[in-house]
Each structure stands twice: as structure tokens, then as C-alpha cells.
């Protein structure tokens, strides 16, 4: 995932000059997501799937890494931009204002104690070092208050900053003393300044935090600015920035969620909002919900702008990894598997800095064609294809008859195909493809592996992660025809 701070902050230099900034985290391995049907099955097969993936990556030395990047702009840009930069629901497209990398974050170890180092973390937006300051973003200002209030209640009192995970590495002195669960033992008679005892901490104006001296004008009122009133234009821009497959997924997600809403009036009201974003999206959702007629578009404070261009930076597919690094290949094996072919495949995947896991009829493993024993990571029932980014079927003529009788083996193949994953297979696995119902639909994402050249071609394609051209044929998020 990417991280996006939504708020506008300030960078303030030593001369008290301010530059607006928006923060981004950009994953080194690119963006990736799963289909809804796939997510449901993942949660059933392994509820800890994502945290296990993170844990295994760190333990194996494949440290997840993000780039810290910023969008920087001045007051003149803010005054002339199409939307209010203080509106946290709006973005500045990266095509207009590119992000600039300024640092990185590498996750290279797990916490020693999850409660002490994770559960007790007191995250607060107002915790910033000198040089970073706040804008008048109303949601940010609200969070600067409410997060402190939250920690007072969540962690039991004002001294949560004494907990090691929340305490500064360099001891800081202030006038805060005692209170519930205090962990410090200050000495002396005075904890205030000035005092006649000559004790206690002293103010350090040159080193303390100073807010940016911004010039302010206008009325102070609890009103949402008119500049925040355009609720649909960037929603439309986001939708048209997606690929066809992603648009189908959005329509399917909206359909699923709205299908759980009991009130027809609310379903109609939501579709009326969609009409202000994209008519095709709205009619697709309405068709899937069984509407007999379309509602009128919702009243809009401002008309939806049609001149905003698509931003490819908003698409997961357009910004996919294009490499298999950090991903996982699941290989189904059986007794009599071609040991030479398996070894070559393992070597090729390792060269891509990816990992393999073996799935077999028994977790104890199989006996290869050269007589060697190969241990498995999963038995077929416990290692469905949803746990892997791509799959390979390396079976044997002697074992395939038993494999095709196993529902879990057939589901392994059918799900991988339905979820548009790349599938490699040897000649002996053809009966399994037939039983899974995909032998007549083989495409550029189903590749027969006979030798090292086939393996090289297969591994080279894995970076795409999904065979997007297959999706309409498997009806995964397929769009319905519009209502007239």
C-alpha cells in the first residue's frame, strides 16, 4: 500500500520561510491488491495472511521498504490550484505536482513485545519536530486536539509519554509533574520558572519549538468553506483514472455493499450520488441492484467538472510492480515430480528475489522421479492458490489420476484461473486443467513448462502479477449493460 497523509502541513526553514507540504509513502515493491472473491477465501484459509507475509519477509531478510516523498508548493500555487489545499478530501495530482523523494523507511525487525511496542503507541498528529508545522486544515486542527484527548483515555492518564515507546530517546525536562501512573521522580522544591530557588528546568528559546508566524485575516466561524463544496469532480477524476478492470471492481464493490442496505430509498440515494460522478458507473450499479428505473442525480452544491484529466498515478494497475520480487509462487507437486524441472524453477524464482512454497497431497512431501524426497510446506487442502501470487503444477503421470479426484486440487487450479493469476504446468497436469474446467480457455497466462527456456519465459511474465485480459471471460467484476 501507499501511505498518504491527506493533510497539508508546512515546512519551515531557519529563516522562518514556509512551504506547504503533503507527505507520501511509496512502496518500493509497487502497489498490489486482491479481488473481493480472493480476499474472502484468503481470510478463510489464513486470517493472519498479511501479517504472516510481513513477518516472513522481515525474517527472511527481504525487508519491506517505502520511500518518503513530498509534494511541495507555495502560497501562490495554493491560491491558483483548482481546489482548496486545506480540504483533506482533495488531492493534488502527481502529474501536476510530482512527488520528490526525501527519505526511506525500512522494516528490518519485528517488535520484541507487541504490547509494549505497538499496542501502547500514542500516535498524535501534533507530535512534530522543529521545521514541520501545521496549516489551517480544519480536520488537522481537530485531530491536533482530539488525538491527545484520545490518548488520555486510551492509556489511562496524562503520563503516557513516560512509557518507553512514547518517550523521547533524549531526556527532556518540562514542568509536568506527578499525576496518574507517573514514572519519574523529580527532585527539588520548584517545578516552575522563574523561581527564587534556582532549581528546575529552564526555557531554551533557541532550541524549543516555535510555530510559524503566519498572517491571518478573515472571519473566524464554524462554517465549512465554500471552497470545500465540490464533492464530485475529484471522485470522477479518480474513477476515470482507473483501468477498465479496476472500474469493474469499483462497480462490483459498490453493488455488494449497497446490496446489504435494507432501505431501497438509501440505495437509490447512493446511486443518485454516483450519477454525479459517472453515468456508466451509476447505471452499472443500478442494473446489478435490480433497479427498474434510474433516480434523479443528487442535488450538487457545485456542478461536476468534466475538464479534469485522468491521473494514471491513481491506478494500482498502472503503477504495479512489474517484477516478482517479494512475491510468492505456489508449486503443486506430487510423487514422480520432475526433480530437474523443479530445481530449475526454484533457481529462477530465487533470482527474482521471490520465494516458493510447495503444496503436496501430504505435508510430509513427495518422492521425485530421481528418488529424492521433497518436503512440502502445505497439504493441498491447507494451501489454496489464493495464498500465492502465481502457481505452477508439476505433477506426474503416475500421480495425476489421484489428484484430479481431489476437490481441493481442482479448486486450486480453478481459483488461480478465476483470479487471473499466471499458471505454469507440465504436460502431466493437463487432466487436472481439464477437470478444473479451464483446458479450453488457456491463454497467455497459462504456460506449459518443459525446459529452462519455458521457465525463463514464465518467470519473466510473473512481474505483471495478473492476466488482465482474462478477467471478462471469468466474469470477475464484469460490468452489466447500462439501463436505457
Positions of PLM-derived features:
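Internal mixed beta-strand/loop scaffold within catalytic domains of large alpha/beta enzymes
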Residues: 1-40, 47-49
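Charged, compositionally biased interaction regions
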Residues: 48-52, 56-322
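Short helix/loop capping segments that flank catalytic or ligand/cofactor-binding pockets
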Residues: 19-22, 31-34, 78-79, 113-117, ...
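Extended, subdomain-level signal for the structured scaffold at the beginning of enzyme domains
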Residues: 218-222, 244, 248-268, 272-418, ...
Amino acid at each position: 500500500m501507499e501511505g498518504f497523509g491527506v493533510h497539508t502541513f508546512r515546512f519551515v526553514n531557519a529563516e522562518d520561510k514556509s512551504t506547504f507540504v503533503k507527505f507520501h509513502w511509496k512502496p518500493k515493491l509497487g502497489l498490489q491488491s486482491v479481488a473481493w472473491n480472493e480476499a474472502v477465501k484468503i481470510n478463510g484459509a489464513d486470517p493472519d495472511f498479511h501479517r504472516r507475509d510481513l513477518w516472513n519477509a522481515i525474517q527472511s531478510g527481504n525487508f519491506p521498504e517505502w520511500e518518503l516523498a513530498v509534494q511541495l508548493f507555495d502560497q501562490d500555487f495554493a491560491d491558483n490550484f483548482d481546489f482548496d489545499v486545506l480540504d483533506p478530501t482533495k488531492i493534488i495530482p502527481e502529474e501536476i505536482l510530482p512527488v520528490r523523494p526525501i527519505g526511506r523507511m525500512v522494516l528490518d525487525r519485528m517488535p520484541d513485545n507487541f504490547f509494549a511496542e505497538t499496542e501502547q503507541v500514542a500516535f498524535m498528529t501534533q507530535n512534530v519536530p522543529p521545521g514541520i508545522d501545521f496549516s489551517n486544515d480544519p480536520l488537522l486542527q481537530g485531530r491536533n486536539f482530539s488525538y491527545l484527548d484520545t490518548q488520555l483515555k486510551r492509556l489511562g492518564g496524562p503520563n503516557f509519554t513516560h512509557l518507553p515507546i512514547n518517550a523521547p530517546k533524549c531526556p527532556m525536562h518540562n514542568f509536568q509533574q506527578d499525576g496518574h501512573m507517573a514514572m519519574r521522580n523529580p527532585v527539588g522544591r520548584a517545578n516552575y520558572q522563574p523561581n527564587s530557588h534556582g532549581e528546575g528546568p529552564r526555557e531554551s528559546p533557541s532550541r524549543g519549538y516555535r510555530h510559524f508566524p503566519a498572517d491571518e485575516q478573515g472571519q473566524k466561524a464554524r462554517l465549512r468553506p465554500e471552497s470545500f463544496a465540490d464533492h464530485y469532480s475529484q471522485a470522477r477524476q479518480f474513477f476515470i483514472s482507473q483501468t477498465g478492470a479496476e472500474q469493474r471492481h469499483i462497480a462490483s464493490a459498490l453493488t455488494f455493499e449497497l446490496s446489504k442496505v435494507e432501505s431501497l430509498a438509501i440505495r437509490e440515494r447512493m446511486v443518485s450520488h454516483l450519477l454525479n460522478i459517472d453515468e456508466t458507473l451509476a447505471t452499472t450499479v443500478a442494473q446489478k441492484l435490480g433497479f427498474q428505473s434510474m433516480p434523479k442525480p443528487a442535488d450538487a452544491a457545485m456542478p461536476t467538472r468534466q475538464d479534469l484529466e485522468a491521473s494514471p498515478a491513481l491506478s494500482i494497475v498502472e503503477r504495479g510492480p512489474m517484477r516478482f520480487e517479494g512475491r510468492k509462487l505456489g508449486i503443486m507437486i506430487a510423487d514422480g515430480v520432475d526433480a530437474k524441472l523443479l530445481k530449475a524453477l526454484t533457481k529462477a524464482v530465487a533470482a527474482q528475489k521471490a520465494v516458493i512454497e510447495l503444496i503436496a497431497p501430504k505435508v510430509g512431501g513427495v518422492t521425485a522421479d530421481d528418488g529424492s524426497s521433497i518436503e512440502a510446506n502445505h497439504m493441498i487442502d491447507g494451501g489454496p492458490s489464493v495464498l500465492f501470487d502465481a502457481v505452477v503444477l508439476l505433477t506426474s503421470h503416475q500421480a495425476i489420476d489421484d489428484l484430479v479426484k481431489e476437490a481441493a486440487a481442482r479448486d486450486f487450479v480453478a481459483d488461480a484461473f478465476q483470479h487471473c493469476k499466471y499458471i505454469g504446468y507440465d504436460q502431466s497436469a493437463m487432466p487436472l486443467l481439464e477437470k478444473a474446467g479451464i483446458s479450453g480457455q488457456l491463454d497467455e497466462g497459462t504456460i506449459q513448462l518443459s525446459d529452462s527456456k519455458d521457465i525463463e519465459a514464465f518467470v519473466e511474465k510473473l512481474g505483471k502479477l495478473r492476466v488482465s485480459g482474462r478477467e471478462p471471460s471469468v466474469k470477475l467484476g464484469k460490468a452489466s449493460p447500462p439501463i436505457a
